Amino acid sequence: MRVSRYFGTDGIRGRVGQGLISADFVLRLGNALGRVLAQGRDTRPMVLIGKDTRISGYMFESALEAGLVAAGADVQLIGPMPTPAIAFLTNTLRADAGVVISASHNPHDDNGIKFFSAMGEKLDDATEAAIEAAIEAPFLTVDSEYLGKVKRTRDAIGRYIEFSKASVPRGFTLRGLKLVLDCAHGATYHIAPMLFRELGAELVTIGVDPDGLNINAGVGSTHLETLAATVRESGADLGIAFDGDGDRVLMTDAQGRTVDGDDLLYVLARAWRASGRLKGTVVGTLMSNYGLEQALGTLGIPFIRARVGDRYVHQALVESGGVLGGEASGHLLCLDRATTGDGIVSALQVLEVLRHEGLTLSQALLGLHKVPQKTVNVCWSGPARAAVEMPEVRQALVEAQAAVQGRGRVFLRPSGTEPVVRITVEADDVVLMQQTLDRLADVVRDAA
C-alpha cells in the first residue's frame, strides 16, 4: 500500500488555517492538479469545483481557482452542491477532473479537498502520487495567452435532480408518504427538498438554513436526535438524514429508531436479490455488524469485507463484480446507478423498495438481527497510526479479542480523517461488549 504524504482515505482534510488546509497550500494544490492534467495534451484541461456550505469554502474555492488557472486549466465553478453531484457533473460535462471543497460530517472549522477523475470516480493511487510530486515542484504560471478561463455553471441543480430521479423507475412516486428530511445545513439543503417534493412526498425539513457556521451542528447523519424527535412528533412515515456534503444517508423509522448503513444494505440486498437486480458480492467493511453477514448468508447472498473507507468498498465491488456495498456510517454505493456514494440516490433506492413491497421501514428489517456493537473515539495527539504499534495497546487488543472469541469481534484502527483512534467491540452479550470496550479504551487513553 502506498504511503501518502498528503492524501488520507478521503482526500485531504484538517483544521482551517492549519497545515494542509490553508489558502497557500490549496493554491499550490490547484496548481499541481492543473499541471498533472495538462501533461501530454495540447488543449487546456477543464476542472469542476464544487463545495459544501462552510464559510471557508469561499477562500479555498478562490485558491484552487487561481492555482488551476495559473497552470493553464479552465475552471467551472458549481457552487454549493453535494459531493456525488460533482462526481456526476464531472462525467456528464466532460471535465477532466472534479474537486469538492468539504470536510463531510466534520464541523465548520474543518475543511478538506476531494478529487474525482473524468469518469466521476475517486482518484487512483498513481494520480494522487503524481499530484503530490507536483506540489513539491516550483509553482507554475504559464504565459499569459495560455492562462485558463473561469465560468460559473448555471444549470447544475437541474441536471443533478434529473439524474437522481432517473435512478428510480419512471412511474415511481412518493405521494402519500410523509417524510422528515435533515440536510445538516449542508450541501443538500437546496436540492433534496426540491427533489422529494417533485416526487410527491409531504415534507418536514430541518437543517436547511446554512449560515456558513452551522453545518453538521446538532443535525445531519451524525446527530439523529432532532430527526428522530421530529419524526415522532410529526407522525411521519420515516426520517432521512444526510451529512454535510451529501454522500452519506441514515434513516429513522416511524418510531424514531436509527436505521444505519448496515440496515439499509440489508434492505437493498434482500430486495435486489429477489428482483434479480443484485449482481456479484455485497461488500461491507471490517466495521460492518456481524448480524448483517449472518442475515445475508441466510439468504444465500455472498458478503465480503473491505477496509474502512468508501474508496476501498468501491475497489472491492469492482474486483468482485458487485453493485452494492457500503458502511454503517451511511456511505452506500449503488454502482448500477452512481459512480460514488450518493446519499440522495441511495435514499431513493430504499424508498423504491419500500413502495414496491408495500412495507414500512421497520417491516423491511425484520430479517436482520444485529449483535450489540459500540464504537468509541479516543483522541490521539500524535500520528494516530502509531497507536496500533504500541506494545501495551497491542497486548490489550489481543486480550480483548480473546475475551469475545466465538461471540464477537474487536477492532482498533486510526481514523483516516480525524486525529482519533476508533475502537469497536461487538459481542452477543451487551455486558461483555461494554466491559471489553472499556478495558481496551482505558489502555489506549493511558498510552495517548
From Swiss-Prot:
Keywords for the protein's UniProt record, in alphabetical order: Isomerase, Magnesium, Metal-binding, Phosphoprotein
Modification(s) after translation: Activated by phosphorylation.
One GO MF term attached to the UniProt entry: phosphoglucosamine mutase activity
Gene for this chain: glmM
Residues annotated with Phosphoserine modification: 104
Sequence similarity: Belongs to the phosphohexose mutase family.
Pfam families, alphabetized: PGM_PMM_I, PGM_PMM_II, PGM_PMM_III, PGM_PMM_IV
Binding-site residues for Mg(2+), renumbered to this chain: 104, 243, 245, 247
Cofactor binding: number and manner: Binds 1 Mg(2+) ion per subunit.
Function recorded in the entry: Catalyzes the conversion of glucosamine-6-phosphate to glucosamine-1-phosphate.
Organism: Xylella fastidiosa (strain Temecula1 / ATCC 700964)
Name of the molecule in the record: Phosphoglucosamine mutase
